[in-house]
């Protein structure tokens, strides 16, 4: 019961704002103040959602099958390179300008090259998501390691920790707040790239569903798919927030 009260206390203002936004949208659409094609009424959106209720889970699993491996691979690359750059000043000074120059190129601009060079459309889509995932997590890892409180390193020296043990026991945990902050940015932006990536290789997927219906001018379906994607993103972010709080339970709130 205490958890329910805490949840209500934390999110009641959010709930009021959501109800106000939905009520406002209902009012302006029924009053004819917006284009009825681009902005269908909530009833039409709900009807479209119920029509494709059986398809939505399939779209979800298809998107996750593309997104999760890509996120995992991108995160591994970002952590490996970020730790190397963060701990070795010479490596950092040598490759940081190159990494920074590459990172400013949007993933979408690389799509023509990915489509021509990748062995399949799926591989091209995964490359775009991996590429997009790397940079925020990479730079956050470098920053987190570079700004570690010197007391942590002194304590590690006192305990005679070095090499992999020092990395796992001291450096990575101390840099974890920064790393997770960067990963949140990567996670959010990956959904945007997912929509673009699914244009090429998907027959199902949340982004594919939205783009396909938008191309055909079926905006009832487009809104239904769009809101479903938002719901998924909110749930994913809440799950990650729980994981982050567990990993950072040793820090101050």
Feature roles, as predicted:
Residues 89, 146, 181-184, 223-253:
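C-terminal transmembrane helix and the adjacent membrane-cytosol boundary/short C-terminal tail
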Residues 100-136, 143-144:
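Generic hydrophobic transmembrane alpha-helix motif, especially the helices
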Residues 69-99:
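Transmembrane-helix boundary motif in ABC transporter permease subunits
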Residues 182-231, 241:
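Non-cytoplasmic
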Residues 6, 30-72:
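Periplasmic/extracellular loop-to-transmembrane helix junction in inner-membrane transport proteins
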Residues 127, 131, 163-197, 240:
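Transmembrane alpha-helices
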Residues 1-19, 238-253:
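Transmembrane alpha-helical segments of polytopic membrane transport and secretion proteins
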Residues 145-151, 155-175:
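Short helix-to-coil transition segments within interhelical loops
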């Amino acid at each position: 019961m205490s958890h329910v009260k805490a949840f209500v206390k934390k999110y009641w203002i959010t709930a009021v704002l959501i109800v106000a936004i939905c009520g406002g949208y209902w009012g302006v659409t029924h009053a004819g103040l917006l284009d009825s094609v681009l902005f269908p009424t909530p009833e039409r959106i709900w009807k479209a959602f119920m029509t494709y209720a059986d398809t939505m889970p399939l779209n979800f699993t298809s998107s996750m099958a593309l997104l999760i491996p890509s996120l995992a691979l991108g995160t591994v690359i970002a952590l490996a390179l970020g730790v190397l750059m963060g701990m070795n000043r010479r490596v950092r000074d040598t490759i940081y300008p190159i990494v920074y120059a590459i990172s400013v190129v949007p993933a979408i601009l690389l799509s023509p090259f990915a489509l021509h060079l990748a062995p399949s459309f799926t591989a091209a889509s995964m490359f775009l998501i991996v590429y997009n995932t790397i940079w925020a997590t990479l730079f956050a890892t470098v920053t987190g390691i570079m700004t570690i409180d010197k007391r942590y390193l002194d304590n590690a020296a006192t305990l005679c920790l070095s090499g992999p043990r020092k990395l796992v026991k001291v450096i990575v945990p101390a840099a974890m707040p920064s790393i997770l902050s960067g990963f949140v940015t990567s996670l959010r932006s990956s959904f945007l790239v997912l929509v673009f990536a699914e244009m090429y290789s998907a027959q199902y997927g949340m982004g594919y569903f939205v783009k396909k219906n938008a191309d055909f001018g079926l905006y009832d379906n487009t809104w239904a798919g769009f809101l479903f994607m938002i719901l998924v993103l909110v749930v994913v972010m809440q799950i990650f927030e729980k994981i982050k709080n567990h990993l950072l339970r040793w820090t101050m709130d």
